[in-house]
């Protein structure tokens, strides 16, 4: 009996660990956003989980919404807690309040790549794919979980919670894309979308490898963009590492 109980406890612990993996958490958030986008009116055409070719390989886009009012390119982050960041910073920070201990509340902090920069790469890929059709209005949006408290400074960029996503999209109400162009855009995106499992797996492995290499480079005070040395500097928002080849290379990363 005790063995069965122990096996059950271990099984639940393993299941919780698997469900807490970043990849699964991310996919859960993407599904949540996809369901919200389904409730937009018929004039909005949604495509989820698109992978497009680029000059550097491939890029994966969480959601694209094509409408008469523009093309919305959406990056989903299923994060909770306090989210700190600036529009042009290399990294943002997630701060989580944990359990109450005898010495006070425990907390965790995690850094992650600035999602605005991620989404800029997505918008460039879409522009390149659609270049022969015309120059269309593209509205990039970063959307976080409703459990995230956004303490960010992004005056030129839309960063919202799940609950505000549809209303933010509907705020764009000036028609700028014709019905025929919408059909051509969807056709172009669908034909360019890479669906082969092997290529998608290669993309995921490449992203993980690049993140690891980038982390190691920064730890060794080497610029991951150009290979020059990173030097410590002090700016308006505190101490940071900047590329020694500035202004030729403008890579920076905050120091906490």
Task: For each feature predicted by the language model, list its residue ranges.
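Surface-exposed interaction regions that form or flank ligand-binding interfaces
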Residues: 1-59, 66-71, 77-87, 91-256
